[in-house]
Amino acid sequence: MMKKKPKCQIARTKPSVENVIPYNQFKKTQPRFNGNFSALNNEEYIILFGGGRDLILGSLTPCSSSHLSNQANPQDTSEYGTDLFILNSCIIIWFNGLGYGLEIPYSSVLYHASRRLPDGREGLQLEILLTLERDEVLDMLYQSLAPQACEFDGEEAHAFTVRSVELTIRPKYSIYDRHYNNEIETLFTFENFGVNRGDDLVNNCNEALAVCMDLHGEDVQDQDQEQYQDPSMAFEGAQDLNATYSGLGDTLHGPSVYQNDGLADDLDGDLVMDNVVSRGGPEASMSMEFYANQNLAGRKNSRDDE
């Protein structure tokens, strides 16, 4: 039975020192932890990997929401500023002054990166870019302003289109700004996350997102595999496993092109490739990069040994 994909939810409990533990503190209190991040993907511990306070939430996707600061009539960012919590279980964007937040599962994260600000100043030149797959909660919080599809557009053109929203999270203060919190900070302390302002905050959050995305990578693969095994979700042309090579002309004058209707795993069984191009040799390959400071399993063969 196919598992139901997690979706965004409204968070009613704000992360605090009472219900989460920073990652550095977790390592000190758990001496048996040997750095295996996969062991943290459970509900026994709620670990804080990154985040920050006094953030400004915006959007690159045309949408209407009272939670964003870059609308025609922006809200007071001091009243509706946001806090970001990157946990091992989910991402929480907490809306200060509203009393609730947005809980985002990692399966809904399509892309994350740092984006350079065109009008940035020293120590505040980056912001976080977070692309999320839309669901009912995101549609409620961020109503799309994009034009509706024309009635003449075929349903096939939108069958595999992922509806998304691009959020930007910008620090309010630079690394060099002198700012004092109204309350004593207990989570995002210097001992746990360093200065954690401005560009340092953005870099810390991107590293934390990368680690937590890896923790949940197997969950996404399992969902994709179950979706592929479901006959109702299969492609109509997936049973045709014979890809047709478009000819040597494309190889000489540009990148080779396959007229492929399958699932990109059907490079075998082509007569032109067998007889003309590969001449009985390998028909497909993969480029791999090995770093000098990492141990390799197996051995590497030179071209003369093949």
From Swiss-Prot:
This is Protein LOT5. Its main location: cytoplasm. Belongs to the LOT5 family. It is found in: Cytoplasm; Nucleus. Signal peptide: none annotated. GO terms for biological process: mRNA cis splicing, via spliceosome; spliceosomal snRNP assembly. One of its GO terms (cellular component) is cytosol. It holds the Pfam family Voldacs. InterPro entries: ICln/Lot5/Saf5 (IPR039924). Induction: By cold. Keywords: Cytoplasm, Nucleus. It comes from Saccharomyces cerevisiae (strain YJM789) (Baker's yeast).
